């Protein structure tokens, strides 16, 4: 692992720690949308693969760049892109951090219970694993319940394989 990636992850941890409480539980699962008063239909995202692209995350402590894996998780990447273009994530914080495990964001309510009002299906790939720091994945509350919340791993978390859709990786 190069020092830039380590520094980025440390910066992310500090960013999150400055606005959230820490938990030290191990073996946890990132939590997804649990309650939404209004339910809306999922936009019509096809599962046709798309080209990988990049997203820049702006935080109070700087930027980081993520490669979005449209070739492996096209519905999830299209959903993320759709929400970004709608401004859904503007002003949203990383609301949950577990040291050595992950940071979680994407909840407009900041409580861990918010989401877009619809869910998307899981997309698993035999080529993608939670074997390193910097994996970007969709948080959920069970099979096929992803929405807007996502998390970035702070280390290997292999127990999450085939439980959360991996749709990107931190590259800078």
Describe each region flagged by the PLM.
Residues 2-172:
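Cyclophilin-like peptidyl-prolyl cis-trans isomerases
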